[in-house]
Amino acid sequence: FKHLTMMKTRSFLLSTLAVFIFAGCSSEDAREGNIPGGELDGKAYLSLSLQSHTATSRAVNVEEKPGSSGESKAGAVKVLLFDEDDVCLDVADFDGLTVGNSGGESGGTGTPEAVASDAKLVPEKTKKVFVVINPYTDGSKGWNLTADAVKGKPWSVINTAIEAVIANIATNDNFMMASAGEGAGIEGALMGVTVHKPDGYTQDKIDAAKKEAKDHPAEISVDRLSAKVELAVKDPFSTKPDGAKFTFGGWELSVTNKSVKLYSELITYDNATPGAVYRRDKNYLKSEQPDISDNSTMETNMMATFDYLKNIDNDADLIPEVKRDKGTSCYCLENTMDANAQQLGFTTKVVVKAQYTPNSLTENSSYFSWKGNYYTLEQLKTEYKNTPSGGLKTDLPIFLKKAKLVAGDADQSTIDNFITNLQANGLTAKTGIIGRFCAVRYYHESVCYYDVLIRHDQNVTEKMALGRYGVVRNNWYHLDLQSVSGPGTPWIPDPSDPDPTNPTPPGTDDDESDAYLSVKITINPWTYWTQGVDLH
């Protein structure tokens, strides 16, 4: 795709300078960069330069491209300052600083170049920093990163998860970003900085120390808190078996997280693609996921944690729109899982809407399926009439009742009469959705839906191994539909609403599900991944 632009990890160059303090200068002298006065006891200078690299330091064997200007602009820039015990000392604002590559693409390298800030006063005990760009601070809903809120608090208390929607952290010109981190645990978020002290008390020596600090900056990378998903249809696209017809109709995300951490700790895993990372979100462990042990509360619990594309149960309900065009992208909150927690109910996925018509039928016509065979309405009525008992004589009435075309207590005579007189205009796009989970399926105008679980690391080939599924912040997942070999379901695959009689429960392992795909992923650490998808 022409617009596959990489969301880049940004790098921040920080320089710190501590000075020996002695009396004799005014506060105005200090503001002008002269020898600071006694009122500046316990302070140091901090200089910050923000630069987005054209290749991240952790991505060693993958292609990268700069993000767009809308994905890269830096407005508010907050630097949280910590002592050696990870207790916050203060917050330094670098709003308005020119950030490297914040203008987006330019010949594949990004512009503008980074500009170092003027030195700012910070506590002398500053040993570590955490950077946040474009923070979501909407009242009580977002993070409160003011000095009054965070001073004196340990990093473990500051690093909270909040309930959010993707628009809170990923809108044009306002993508929230935070330090990417390097080490294990949540403390890995904090980058150590070196304090440079002058070897004398003259202005020349102070200036020399400032220059030394800026010449040897600490480098800090930040990630966007969002993940990006894109779907395309390969050209040529393979439709099987021969004679079948497939028309792409749209796509949408489902099972998206409702919470996001300020910093999600890095997780190591076996057979990782060099340069790839995995992280721990709020509901990473199986014990942290929604309680699905009680069917009466399962759906409520799941919907409190994730957003799902939902089916309809009545004609008055509106069918959810699945209409994102091929070649488009959207963003979602990070959603990661421990190895044994990679389950259908909690794994972010793509739902594809399409029209699939079997080779024996008129393209985009309505049809029924039953036990692997496809029928027009008239063919189904004939098959039903010629079946003395059992088989379709049993299964079709079950579907009609579930679809609310006949009353639940209708007797055999009433059902037979209804089927005899049933016409195509008595069936709608909602019929097959309301009548879901039956042996008989109805595809109105050949419309169906496919489930595509998003794989994280293609290099993880062992089933249910850590790092195999999930969407990670600052990762861009490109799904490429390559082929199709059969119709999907007439209803939206929704793990929070499983088949009550023959369920694939939300607790089913991702690698044991009957998802309609086989996948292939290659990594590019926005970290950029390509996933080939075969629908069936």
Which stretches of residues belong to each language-model region?
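Short, Lys/Arg-enriched N-terminal segments with co-localized hydrophobic residues
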Residues: 1-6
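Sec-dependent signal peptide recognition
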Residues: 8-15
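N-terminal "leader" segments that precede or initiate the main folded domain
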Residues: 17-18, 28
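C-terminal motif of bacterial Sec signal peptides marking the signal peptidase cleavage site
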Residues: 21-24
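Acidic/polar, low-complexity intrinsically disordered N-terminal segments immediately downstream
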Residues: 28-192, 196-201, 224, 476, ...
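Tryptophan-paired
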Residues: 58, 66-147, 219, 228-232, ...
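Flexible, solvent-exposed coil segments and beta strand-coil junctions
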Residues: 203-213
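Substrate-binding/catalytic groove segments of enzymes
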Residues: 484-493
